[in-house]
């Protein structure tokens, strides 16, 4: 029957003889007394005969309002607690990702960007962003473009979410529905000379037929791996001195893990690793690396350290890329490339057919003329 202190008031309540002052006193007490609140619930749940003995209407004893007021207070208290916990989670997330000069936040952004550019030929991450959420979560968007001539064409958008350092792909959308680039390479150790010559002839014939006012994207495979310094005179020998010669935009990196199979020798997406002409880092130390070779080796180090993330971004089996072995090979043997994606005027690219160093070619996209310096 409620607590002993208010026993007499409860008896008056059941008889319907409470005064207005006694009613207010009992209401205030019920809000702070769990025992009396339980007793009130029991009284309200009783059958009709008990309800008939409730105080007359003119006494205005709305005890049901006390019950609901208490419930709303409880709900409000829970909501406040949830908001406080969420705010604390946000502060902890900000501290976790932005500590040490945003190191973890840069990793969340850097690794997927490098992975996309390393596994998708002629791709660059040129937009998007990362938002830090409560409880050590982030959401990121990566806007990809490809370079055809002097124009950057939208390629697609990748969206990711992460918890701590674990990353997942949440959405992929390509401009051309399903992205299937016609960019392939062949390793120099493959001996299928006749096939490579015939397949490449189709590319050269197409470039010969297209209008002069076009630019194109061509992937070429070399007769051996070359250093970046060795490529400069090789390309100069093809295009000679020009104000705006065709531009290399992506390189197929020789990592010692390329498939060498005379029956299955065409390397497509997932079979190779490469790097763009301009490797983008968020980390200040990596950005300050002086040479392209040093940047490539650092890129491979980062990718090998985060192999699970790279495989998720590239949507490849965990054992396919062997990034640890690739990184070690490049570090020990230096940066050499066995192919590249190059873009420029279609008729200029046609000159590559005369180079003794080009064994194989595939044709990517062709666009209307945009070959001018902005």
Please name every model-derived segment.
Residues 15-16, 44-51:
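Short cysteine/histidine-rich zinc-coordinating motifs and their immediately flanking basic loops
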Residues 62-70, 74:
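Membrane-helix interfacial "entry" motifs
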Residues 1-10:
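Short, charge-enriched, intrinsically disordered boundary segments that mark the beginning
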Residues 17-42:
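N-terminal amphipathic alpha-helical interaction or autoinhibitory segments
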Residues 282-374:
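Extracytoplasmic/luminal low-complexity segments enriched in Pro/Gly and acidic/polar residues
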Residues 48-65, 94-193:
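N-terminal, intrinsically disordered, polar/charged segments of Gram-positive cell-envelope systems
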Residues 142-280:
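Extracytoplasmic beta-rich ectodomain segments of secreted or membrane-anchored proteins
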Residues 75-92:
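Hydrophobic membrane-insertion alpha-helices, especially the h-region
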């Amino acid at each position: 029957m409620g607590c002993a202190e208010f026993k007499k008031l409860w008896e008056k309540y059941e008889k319907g003889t409470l005064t207005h002052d006694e009613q207010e006193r009992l209401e205030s007490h019920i809000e702070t007394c769990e025992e009396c609140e339980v007793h009130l619930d029991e009284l309200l749940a009783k059958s009709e005969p008990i309800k008939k003995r409730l105080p007359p209407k003119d006494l205005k004893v709305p005890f049901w309002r006390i019950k609901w007021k208490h419930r709303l207070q409880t709900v409000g208290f829970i909501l406040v607690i949830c908001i406080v916990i969420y705010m604390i989670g946000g502060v902890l997330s900000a501290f976790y990702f932005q500590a040490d000069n945003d190191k973890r936040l840069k990793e969340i952004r850097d690794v997927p960007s490098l992975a996309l550019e390393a596994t998708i030929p002629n791709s660059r991450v040129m937009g998007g962003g990362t938002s830090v959420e409560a409880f050590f979560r982030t959401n990121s968007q990566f806007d990809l473009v490809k370079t055809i001539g002097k124009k950057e064409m939208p390629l697609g958008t990748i969206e990711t979410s992460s918890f701590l350092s674990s990353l997942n792909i949440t959405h992929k959308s390509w401009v051309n529905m399903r992205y299937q680039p016609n960019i392939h390479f062949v390793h120099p150790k493959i001996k299928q000379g006749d096939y490579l010559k015939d397949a490449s002839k189709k590319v050269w014939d197409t470039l010969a037929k297209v209008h002069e006012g076009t630019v194109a994207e061509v992937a070429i495979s070399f007769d051996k791996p070359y250093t970046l310094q060795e490529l400069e005179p090789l390309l100069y020998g093809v295009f000679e001195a020009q104000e705006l010669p065709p531009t290399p935009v992506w390189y197929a990196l020789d990592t010692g893990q390329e498939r060498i199979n005379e029956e299955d020798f065409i390397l497509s997406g997932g079979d190779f690793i490469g790097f763009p002409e301009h490797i983008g880092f968020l980390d200040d130390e990596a950005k300050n690396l002086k040479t392209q070779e040093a940047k490539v080796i650092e890129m491979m180090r980062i990718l090998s350290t985060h192999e699970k993330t790279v495989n998720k971004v590239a949507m490849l089996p965990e054992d396919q890329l062997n990034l640890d072995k690739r990184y070690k090979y490049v570090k020990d043997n230096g940066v050499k490339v066995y192919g590249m994606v190059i873009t420029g005027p279609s008729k200029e690219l046609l000159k590559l057919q005369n180079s003794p160093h080009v064994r194989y070619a595939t044709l990517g996209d062709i666009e209307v003329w945009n070959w001018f310096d902005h």
